[in-house]
From Swiss-Prot:
Organism: Bartonella henselae (strain ATCC 49882 / DSM 28221 / CCUG 30454 / Houston 1)
One Pfam assignment: ATP-synt
Protein name: ATP synthase gamma chain
GO terms of biological process kind: proton motive force-driven plasma membrane ATP synthesis
SUPFAM superfamilies in UniProt: ATP synthase (F1-ATPase), gamma subunit
Length: 303
């Protein structure tokens, strides 16, 4: 049985931990509001960008479309870009994204495909390296970045473009977590390359589900200057950066939501543990006092 001193030390230790978890919860809550606004603001822009590309693609011969849009025409080598958080203490946030990527890797390997993995975020790299270290070709570290901006998305986009130009892959899929609510973050697989399906329509959807390409925009007839093909040459790389930027913003919002929830649960658990330890301490102290009183009374009677 633990002594009174041991129980006092444990209570003090748990209280100190509870102060830390409460502080982290407050910090995550403050950051969540800003991150949530940024993620929500990026969604319509990314969606409109996809709709514009869909409209442009209808006016351009697939042969004249940028290579990023039409792809290589093969389906042999798959690049998986897995975006997770740089830090932990956010519940199952990172594990869910890595699990989604791992399931996709297993499916591709079972189909005889070649898989390459590019990780963004330390936690995803740590998780995937346990089973698929041989497949990981590079890692992008954003730990020193205090606030993710478009520059970071452009850097990741350029890395993907460089790999594509080197004929390093045929298909590129982006994995991240879509922010649904504070307690709900949904892991998503999003097709980046190619952007054009076999039917000629721009694919800006998840691997399993296509994003709405805004029928109202597609029904409008546009005049392009100098021409649609020239605009695609500029907008396709830009769209790649925009979609990655949106994914990074969604990830930040999801991470803050998961961290706030995890720290709230940790604080509650710490409170329950403090109550249990306090009850144990009081019972043991009461028993000790009772024993001392009995000894005093017994000694007095002996006299």
């Amino acid at each position: 049985m633990a002594s009174l001193k041991d129980l006092r030390d444990r209570i003090a230790s748990v209280k100190a931990t509870q102060k830390i978890t409460k502080a982290m919860q407050m910090v995550a809550a403050a950051r969540l509001h800003r991150a949530q606004e940024a993620a929500h603001s990026a969604r319509p822009y990314a969606k409109r960008m996809a709709a514009i590309l869909a409209n442009l693609a209808n006016d351009v011969d697939p042969i004249d479309a940028p290579s990023l849009m039409r792809g290589t025409g093969r389906d042999d080598v798959h690049l998986l870009v897995v975006c997770t958080a740089e830090r932990g203490l956010c519940g199952a946030f990172n594990v869910q994204i890595a699990r989604r990527a791992r399931e996709h890797i297993k499916t591709l390997l079972a189909a005889g495909k070649i898989v390459k993995v590019l990780t963004v975020g330390k936690k995803g790299a740590d998780i995937l390296s346990r089973d698929y270290k041989a497949l990981m070709i590079d890692h992008i570290d954003l730990q020193s970045i205090k606030r993710v901006g478009f520059a970071e998305a452009a850097m990741i986009s350029q890395k993907i473009v460089d790999l594509f130009d080197d004929d390093a892959f045929d298909v590129c899929t982006l994995f991240y977590s879509e922010f649904v609510s504070v307690i709900n973050q949904r892991p998503v697989a999003f097709g980046l390359v190619p952007m054009v399906s076999s039917g000629g329509a721009v694919e800006t959807a998840e691997v399993e589900q296509k994003i709405d390409n805004s029928a109202d925009l597609q029904s409008i007839v546009y005049d392009y200057e100098p021409d649609a093909a020239s605009l695609l040459d500029v907008l396709v790389p830009r769209n790649l950066s925009v979609q990655i930027f949106r994914a990074l913003l969604e990830n930040v919002a999801g991470e803050m939501g998961a961290k706030m929830t995890a720290m709230d649960n940790a604080s509650r658990n710490a409170g329950e543990m403090i109550n249990k330890l306090t009850v144990a301490y009081n019972r043991q102290r009461q028993a000790q006092i009772t024993t001392e009183l009995i000894e005093i009374i017994a000694g007095a009677e002996a006299l």
